[in-house]
């Protein structure tokens, strides 16, 4: 049974909703342009240990935006129902790549970077398997939940099959190690299952079982404990653990109303690590000011609103569920990133969709947008509007 805010009957006859998909495409384009500008400003004076200069980050991101934009356009014009056939291969490929980064003999294509093995170098492109897994889990969960229908309310034949597949994927992401992405993938699967009608009681049981596991995962690494202490008790946390969050707040505060100007921020000069990715919202706050922060919030808020409107009136159950999941993929990721930047959440390393540097993240966000638009266009085919 679907939750009441999802309209199972779909849109009414002759309802022209083309403005929603057009506005969604426009929002994605604006966010990408905003992101390219922000990445350039955040990395303009950066030189990496490997000799890369900051402008290379913006150029690489721009190339990713072009490729992702082309793919999103093609997906927007395709039939989203085909993704049901691709769900199993996608989850299989994602799981395979997640295993590849953990194998002891694959360091050549999956090197250790910043203490973790999270990327696979395929020669012409470097891929982050957990980003692919994020998208694949949403599509796969939506596919299977749509097939199960009312059986989703049972545990053995409903929820258990999802756990058998999703739990190992989440576990592989955790082993990279990437706890924040593992939790995000679990949350996205939960959103789709909840929307499909899974019992709240089952989620409560999973919460009781999962809470000790989450505590154990945090306790398994000193840096995770430090991050949680920074959030819960900043005064008792090590100084190096509070540094990032403190500098993030300093940068946002320094921006005041209109910001210090594009490329003029000081926090990126060694004070705030990963100002172009993990903390790009802070860079926007410093260089674009309160006005820039509000613009970002409005853009993401409108994107999520449109995504749920598309989901509510999708032509079939799979379309409804995949639209909810992909909207949550963008919305939850943005909320986590912004929450960390404002010290409202422990540091996670979750990127800001469309904006943070990272071509895997950008590609997934654009692909998600393309599929969302496809769901929106599918409604018009269903209700007879050309």
Which positions does each model-derived feature cover?
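Membrane-helix boundary/helix-loop-helix interface segments in multi-pass membrane proteins
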Residues: 2-31, 37-177, 328, 338-353, ...
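Membrane-helix interface "capping/anchor" motifs
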Residues: 78-85, 151, 195-204, 316-317
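Hydrophobic alpha-helical segments of polytopic membrane proteins
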Residues: 88-89, 93-95, 156-175, 179-219, ...
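Juxtamembrane membrane-interface segments at transmembrane alpha-helix termini
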Residues: 97-110, 194-204, 214-224, 333-339
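Hydrophobic, glycine- and aromatic-enriched re-entrant/interface helices and adjoining loop segments
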Residues: 110-119, 123, 202-296, 314-322
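Interfacial segments of multi-pass membrane proteins
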Residues: 145, 183, 188-202, 267-292, ...
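Hydrophobic alpha-helical segments of membrane proteins
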Residues: 175, 179, 183, 259, ...
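Hydrophobic transmembrane alpha-helices and their immediate junctions
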Residues: 291-334
